[in-house]
Amino acid sequence: KKEILDDLNYHIIKGELLAIRAYIHFDLLRLYGYGNWSQRDTELDEKRTIPYATEVSKDPAPQYSGAETIKLLLNDLNEAAALLKDYDPITKTKAASFYQEYNEEGFFNERTLRMNYYAVKALQARVYLWRGKNEDIDSRN
């Protein structure tokens, strides 16, 4: 909830969580979603694949088609990248002194070992490659 966290922590925590959700669902799709999409995308786009959980509920998440699942994955990754781009210390868009008051307990230490902005961009590229849509990879950022 945005009203509980300050702006910096909100952007980093929500960005990480969205990226981790996409990462987990992508692994599930790779394991249980009919294999590599790049050679058979038209055949597999309409088949039901995995449930994609976007909220916590006692009811099962709906099972989506391949195209819908990929769209949900990329939406999560795009939102995560947008949240992390200007706030993640690893991007160095802000001076190190900006993070000092927030980093009393070391939360921002070792950003290279966490789901950071560059890990999100790498996962986006991995999804596009697996999907067989290499021309969609955003290499500018």
Question: Whereabouts are the PLM-identified features?
Answer:
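Structured, solvent-exposed acidic/aromatic patches
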Residues: 1-19, 28-141
